[in-house]
Amino acid sequence: DEAGLGYNAWCLAHYGTDRYLNVRPFYPQNFYGGQSPLYTYLLALLIRTVGQGNLSLTLLKIPAVLASLLLFFVGTKSIRLVFDDQKWSIAAAFLLAVCPYYIMSARFALDCNLMLCCSAVALLFFIRFTQTKTLRNLILSGVFFGITMYSYALSYFLIPIFLICISLYLLYTKEISFRRVLLWAACVC
């Protein structure tokens, strides 16, 4: 997967096509299937800017490392917002630091690793919205849920189900108006 992702990103950075000569594909093809566009296009951007047109193993893993670092800070911030206690956020930071999946996700350049980071950022803004009721947090939550849809194919299925369930719950408890749910859905799209 890493090799196919890297080669597609290199081809996109140099020629604007994937390795099968599809011009700027929405859903790039990998060996025996597709791959999510977010990692591919992030890596193509890095190849054009930071890598000066060259692809290296280090450059291939930079998005995964940055996503893992962002997940660490977003995860601890989310726990602090939910529990309103620094002890819980320190415990969450410790658990993230020793979690084998978290450690391995920074080592492999797989597009599925971006889904966890993007959905955590979306949930952080959603938690902030439920606490502050500010429109800015609702819009940012919707935008990041929309970005999550481009991070991994499974999110095409999971994110809409989650958003429908949470919207129905918030409407039932009168925590959100129907107009704001529609705005949130528009931001996801």
Model-derived regions: residue spans:
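Extracytosolic helix-loop segments that constitute the early lumenal/periplasmic catalytic or substrate-binding loops
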Residues: 3-31, 38-41, 45
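Juxtamembrane segments of multi-pass membrane glycosylation machinery
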Residues: 14-17, 34, 38-66, 100-101
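Short acidic/glycine- and proline-prone juxtamembrane loop motifs at membrane-interface regions
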Residues: 60, 101, 107-112, 154
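Membrane-interface transmembrane helices that cradle and orient dolichyl/undecaprenyl
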Residues: 83, 122-140, 148, 169-174
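Short helix- or helix-capping micro-motifs
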Residues: 92-97, 145, 149, 163
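Hydrophobic alpha-helical membrane-interfacial segments at the cytosolic entry of transmembrane helices
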Residues: 143-144, 159, 166, 175-189
